[in-house]
Design a protein with these regions (language model features):
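Catalytic core of the metallo-beta-lactamase
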Residues: 112-116, 213-269, 285-293
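Divalent metal-coordination and catalytic microenvironments
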Residues: 115, 125, 162, 169, ...
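Active-site metal-binding loops of divalent metal-dependent hydrolases
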Residues: 126-128, 163, 220-222, 252-254, ...
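Acidic/histidine-rich helix-loop elements
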Residues: 128-145, 224-230, 281-287, 315
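Metallo-beta-lactamase
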Residues: 2-132, 137, 146-148, 186-250, 327-347, ...
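Active-site metal-binding motif and surrounding structural segment of the metallo-beta-lactamase
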Residues: 46, 137-184, 268-274
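Cap/insert and terminal regions of metallo-dependent hydrolase folds
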Residues: 18, 23-42, 49, 157, ...
Length: 350
């Protein structure tokens, strides 16, 4: 009996430690907070919020196979070459001293990039500082983490496409706060930013098809979930930025659907389309861009130039790390597409 009681006490102690640790971890600001009643009311009034959550425009299963089938495939077909053996080439540009009298883009790996359009500087989904808890989930490839928030200039517009950890980073946004003049984000995402001490007066939350100051919020085919907030309680989006007669399409994350053709119909030819390419899996084809979906999206948009993102920094899927670059080049060659294919940090004029 004494031994049984001792074992039970040990088990209870372990459970208590785990529970307390979990509670403390979830109190980290990166996890966000409960949404305000006012924000929740606006979300529930959205035509895209139905049956207790945001919905995609087309039916969107999260996975194309059952979870047991995916787990079995992962066990029997383990991924190979997910990370590079050598540091990736990257260029250390000084974003603070880049000109604003011409249009350019500098990519920081994955889906983080800074671009200038008609004198305005736009920063998209910056992930420039690996701190807990993001550092537990993602490890940057060697050579790809050469930029920090300190390297950034003043930002005219910060654009966040959705709440996922690889797009909405607490540590980066905390350190950028004093440099940001205006924030554009989908419905619900501002709850994080306000919790992280961003001035609510500089934040514009948008629903699909709303527009402000030359920026139109548009659909993508994805989802949201950041643990505490619940599934699909904040919106995900793509954006069309128009400035000085030029147009940039920010595709965000999402599986292929008819939206790319509709962007072309509504806005005409865009000067640059920035599209997701990487961290894909056939099991996720409804919520992430596959190589086949990327090619069709490029054809539907028929943009003057294409730049692909969501690769070359983290291994978040099974495919070889170098595959997205090869696929993009093959698509461009096959379809006579102008592909802006440059290493991290390169100044790309467009």
């Amino acid at each position: 009996m004494h031994k049984v009681m001792k074992i039970l006490l040990i088990i209870l102690a372990v459970v208590a430690v785990v529970a307390i640790t979990t509670m403390l971890v979830l109190r980290h600001p990166a996890f966000g907070r409960k949404m305000s009643k006012e924000r929740k009311a606006r979300i529930e009034a959205s035509p895209n919020y139905r049956d207790g959550m945001f919905q995609n425009e087309e039916p969107t299963p999260q996975f194309s196979r059952s979870m047991p089938a995916m787990l079995w495939d992962f066990i029997t077909n383990p991924p190979k070459d997910r990370t590079p053996k050598e540091p990736l080439p990257a260029v250390k540009t000084d974003p603070k001293n880049l000109p604003t009298d011409c249009d350019w883009l500098v990519w920081f790996g994955h889906s983080s990039y800074l671009f200038c359009l008609n004198g305005k500087r736009y920063l998209v989904d910056p992930l420039l500082k690996m701190e807990f808890p993001a550092s537990v989930m993602m490890k940057p490839f060697k050579g790809t983490d050469i930029y920090t928030p300190d390297d950034m200039p003043d930002i005219d517009v910060l654009i966040i496409t959705h709440e996922h950890w690889d797009h909405l980073d607490y540590a980066t946004l905390r350190d950028l706060r004093e440099k940001v003049h205006h924030v554009i984000c989908p419905l619900g995402v501002a709850e994080y930013l306000e919790y992280w001490h961003y001035d609510p007066t500089i934040i514009t939350e948008m629903d699909w098809y709303e527009a402000t100051n030359g920026i139109t919020c548009l659909p993508t085919r994805h989802f949201s979930n950041r643990l505490l907030g619940g599934r699909n309680q904040t919106l995900w989006a793509s954006f069309l930025v128009e400035e000085g007669g030029r147009k940039v399409y920010i595709g965000g994350d999402g599986g292929y659907d008819s939206r790319f053709g509709r962007v072309r119909e509504q806005f005409g030819e865009v000067d640059m389309a920035i599209l997701e390419n990487g961290q894909y899996n056939t099991d996720w084809r409804y919520i992430h861009s596959t190589p086949e979906g990327l090619e069709q999206a490029i054809l539907d948009l028929n943009a003057k130039a294409v730049f692909t993102v969501h690769h070359d920094k983290f291994a978040l899927a099974k495919h070889p790390w170098s595959e997205p670059d090869s696929i993009a080049r093959s698509i461009a060659e096959r379809n006579a597409v102008k592909l802006l294919d440059q290493p991290i940090g390169t100044i790309i004029f467009f």
